[in-house]
Curated annotation (Swiss-Prot):
Protein origin, superkingdom: Eukaryota
Protein keywords: Glycoprotein, Secreted, Signal
Segments of this protein annotated with the region Disordered: 23-100
Glycan attachment points: 44
Record's protein name: Uncharacterized protein EXOC3-AS1
Length: 119
């Protein structure tokens, strides 16, 4: 059970870490406004191309950001005796301990159970 919780909390932390990153890409959002105004002059097809390429670029940078903390965590947090029960609780910041954390735990808890069933 503690192993499942550790897995759930680490993936929940990852979910939580990914959420604030999206609003920070407002530079890209502002960029799309420029693209749309250009597209009105030229035509619809021009707006389609930059949007997809921007999404592709966003996708790659997001996956890189997402895998990096995982690799770091695996160094100082092997899935062995270190996975003590309270260690998982410490991963969650204080303010998050609420309905939002509950939702994250529920979603990622099912992920953990699925992963445990697979192994």
């Amino acid at each position: 059970m503690p192993a499942v919780f550790m897995l759930a909390s680490s993936s929940a932390l990852q979910c939580g870490r990914g959420v604030p990153r999206f609003p920070r890409t407002e530079v890209g959002a502002g960029h799309s406004v420029n693209e749309e105004t250009k597209a009105e002059k030229v035509g619809n097809q021009t707006s389609v191309i930059p949007a997809t390429s921007r999404q592709a670029a966003l996708g790659t940078s997001w996956t890189q950001r997402r895998t990096q903390p995982l690799q770091e965590r695996s160094h100082w947090h092997p899935r062995g005796n270190n996975a003590s029960g309270m260690g998982g609780h410490r991963m969650f910041p204080g303010p998050l301990r609420g309905p939002a954390a509950q939702v994250l735990e529920n979603e990622c808890g099912s992920l953990g159970r699925a992963a445990e069933g697979r192994s």
